[in-house]
Amino acid sequence: MKLTCVVIVAALLLTACQLITALDCGGTQKHRALRSTIKLSLLRQHRGWCGDPGATCGKLRLYCCSGFCDCYTKTCKDKSSA
């Protein structure tokens, strides 16, 4: 009987600790994948990894030097044609 009570109390304490930890996070893990794609895009921009007109672009792909990626064809467009 005592062992059962100890196990129940331990389970309740662990559950409470998990809930407290989840509340303390303050949503820092929300949209983690989205943030990582944005970081990757920014990293590629700053390191000069950009594509010329006609190159494939989009999420997790090459960033366009012109800054214009056609969302339908997933290709870089020239500033004058955008």
Swiss-Prot record:
Family, as annotated: Belongs to the conotoxin O1 superfamily.
4-hydroxyproline sites (modified residues): P53
The UniProt record lists the keyword Translocase: no
Protein's UniProt name: Mu-conotoxin GVIIJ
InterPro entries according to UniProt: Conotoxin (IPR004214)
Role played: Mu-conotoxins block voltage-gated sodium channels (Nav). This toxin (GVIIJ(SSG)) blocks Nav1.1/SCN1A (Kd=11 nM), Nav1.2/SCN2A (Kd=11 nM), Nav1.3/SCN3A (Kd=15 nM), Nav1.4/SCN4A (Kd=4.7 nM), Nav1.6/SCN8A (Kd=360 nM) and Nav1.7/SCN9A (Kd=41 nM). It binds the channel at the newly described site 8, which is composed by two surfaces whose one contains a non-disulfide-bonded cysteine (which is free to covalently bind the toxin Cys-71).
Result when mutating K74D: 13-fold decrease of affinity to Nav1.2/SCN2A
Listed result of changing R61D: 133-fold decrease of affinity to Nav1.2/SCN2A
Residues the record lists as binding a protein: C71
Subcellular compartments: Secreted
Residues of the signal peptide: 1-22
UniProt effect for mutating D70N: No change in affinity to Nav1.2/SCN2A
Organism name: Conus geographus
S-S bridge residues: C50-C65, C57-C69, C64-C76
